[in-house]
Amino acid sequence: MSSVNKDTIHVAERSLHKEHLTEGGNMAFHNHLNDFAHIEDPLERRRLALESIDDEGFGWQQVKTISIAGVGFLTDSYDIFAINLGITMMSYVYWHGSMPGPSQTLLKVSTSVGTVIGQFGFGTLADIVGRKRIYGMELIIMIVCTILQTTVAHSPAINFVAVLTFYRIVMGIGIGGDYPLSSIITSEFATTKWRGAIMGAVFANQAWGQISGGIIALILVAAYKGELEYANSGAECDARCQKACDQMWRILIGLGTVLGLACLYFRLTIPESPRYQLDVNAKLELAAAAQEQDGEKKIHDTSDEDMAINGLERASTAVESLDNHPPKASFKDFCRHFGQWKYGKILLGTAGSWFTLDVAFYGLSLNSAVILQTIGYAGSKNVYKKLYDTAVGNLILICAGSLPGYWVSVFTVDIIGRKPIQLAGFIILTALFCVIGFAYHKLGDHGLLALYVICQFFQNFGPNTTTFIVPGECFPTRYRSTAHGISAASGKVGAIIAQTALGTLIDHNCARDGKPTNCWLPHVMEIFALFMLLGIFTTLLIPETKRKTLEEINELYHDEIDPATLNFRNKNNDIESSSPSQLQHEA
């Protein structure tokens, strides 16, 4: 072969290598596709890239991924804690210690409303334009809206609650977008053996967010102690006290942006998710390879016979794989696919389980005032003592129930499995809510405290963690984000129902019948028990995804065979079927 032809081949090889490179990659998200960009066969390149992800061990790379992906959940839970305490602080500034009930509900529910929009909107968008192009956008929305909240002030022309509610709805859109994106990106980058633990650890950042909020609140209350402790009631909170409270809630909410800003670079520079790049964008590459068949004559005319043979083999492989590739994502195909019961029941199971859980998960907070009173961290009218007790009391409850539950899930979800943990959690919670509801007045304060902590534990070592993990694994790549968004949005709808409709039931006819406040709380707990019972049945619809690759899950539960796996099997079958005489003849 002449030196000119050799140079031409080397240039062509470098060009092909460059053609297969993808953008992005940083310390938290390694670009596995670029490790195999030199492989010309798209199916072989796909197989090797996915194998390198699935077989990877657990190390610092995964710890960094957990940190970067988990910051959104940390910010979300931090904000929930901050706004609950912030509302108390605001009430001293604008309402002499007693914010109207509708205003409180509006500020608390507004974030959930935005979250529903973000979960569905960003979830769908990530399947249309890709994960890389929008990952980080939701964090930018959260950061900007959090900063804007700290600048809101009251004036005759501007309603304080209305403006703050608007910013919280928009911030909720960012928070909602983080649910499907962080879940599916973590899932698609995670090693098969520890995928559940990695996804669970991302979600467990919620506990750290609540703890961070409590610690920062304690520091702020201690720092402003001199401006608060002399006010023994909201009426006694004068201009000095009001200024301190006004500064505290703004600092408390504003500090929620710090970790988000620190992690923003890593989100904006991630590579495209390998599964999305290979599953959704692969058809274009395979179609281009198939066009080589049209140039078969031109290939034979070249002086390099080996290049011609290789070109024909690649074209043949591409044509074969096109027939086995999943259909292109579209609304019509989505309806066709999930309109079939064997596929649609999985979406019903994930969405239904998340809905039933969140009704009770957010409704359980209705008992918080009673629980804090029991452990001696409620009841004081002194401004300093009330803020201090609220922060410390909630920290105790989080560390007693929520935090252990999250991490027991993380350490066992890849051993026990997702479905058994979720099923057992719903069964135990059904029993616990029945006890709380039907024996409420016989339990006593300490009995109620014990059951409250146990409920918190089994919600997190149970469906609260698994309802986040399973939707990120059990759907085809082209609809994984959309389906996760639908499931998560269903949960938030349940939360809104709990905070509005069921939340108001606790005082149903109490004043009319001359009964104390919260007289209907036991019956509300019984309603929550019914939702937990429904969760048992929705859990039966979901598959077990433990220790299976995403491609194996797709083949098992959606009947879509990975083209690279099929190609690899066919090659092995061809080798095994070849007789020794044939192999000797070929040699």
Curated annotation (Swiss-Prot):
Changing C455S: No significant effect on transport activity. Changing D358E: Abolishes transport activity. Causes pronounced increase in secreted phosphatase activity under high phosphate conditions. Moderately decreases signaling activities. Significantly reduces growth rates under low phosphate conditions. Disruption phenotype: Genetic disruption is not lethal. Largely abolished phosphate uptake capacity in phosphate-starved cells. Reduced phosphate uptake in high phosphate conditions. Constitutive expression of PHO5, a repressible acid phosphatase. Increased resistance to manganese, zinc, cobalt and copper under metal surplus conditions. Decreased manganese uptake. Changing C519S: No significant effect on transport activity. Changing K492E: Reduces transport activity. Reduces affinity for inorganic phosphate. Significantly reduces growth rates under low phosphate conditions. No significant effects on growth rates under high phosphate conditions. The keyword Phosphoprotein applies. Phosphorylated; phosphorylation increases after phosphate addition to the growth medium. There is a cross-link at K6, K298 (Glycyl lysine isopeptide (Lys-Gly) (interchain with G-Cter in ubiquitin)). Changing D178 to E/N: Reduces transport activity. No significant effects on affinity for inorganic phosphate. No significant effects on signaling activities. No significant effects on growth rates. Changing K298A: No significant effect on membrane localization under low phosphate conditions and internalization after phosphate addition. Strongly affects vacuolar sorting of the protein after internalization. GO terms for cellular component: endoplasmic reticulum; fungal-type vacuole; plasma membrane. Residues 89-108, 155-156, 223-250, 367-395, 441-442, 507-522 are cytoplasmic. The modification Phosphothreonine is found at T302, T317. Changing D358N: Significantly reduces transport activity. No significant effects on affinity for inorganic phosphate. Causes pronounced increase in secreted phosphatase activity under high phosphate conditions. The chain crosses the membrane at residues 68-88, 109-129, 134-154, 157-177, 202-222, 251-271, 346-366, 396-416, 420-440, 443-463, 486-506, 523-543. It is found in: Cell membrane; Vacuole. Proton-coupled high-affinity transporter for external inorganic phosphate. Acts as a transceptor, a membrane protein that in addition to its transporter activity also possesses receptor-like signaling activity; mediates activation of the protein kinase A (PKA) pathway targets during growth induction, triggered by phosphate addition to cells growth-arrested due to previous phosphate starvation. Is not an essential protein, since constitutive, low affinity phosphate transporters exist in yeast. Can function as a low affinity metal transporter that transports manganese, zinc, cobalt and copper. This is Inorganic phosphate transporter PHO84. The gene is PHO84.
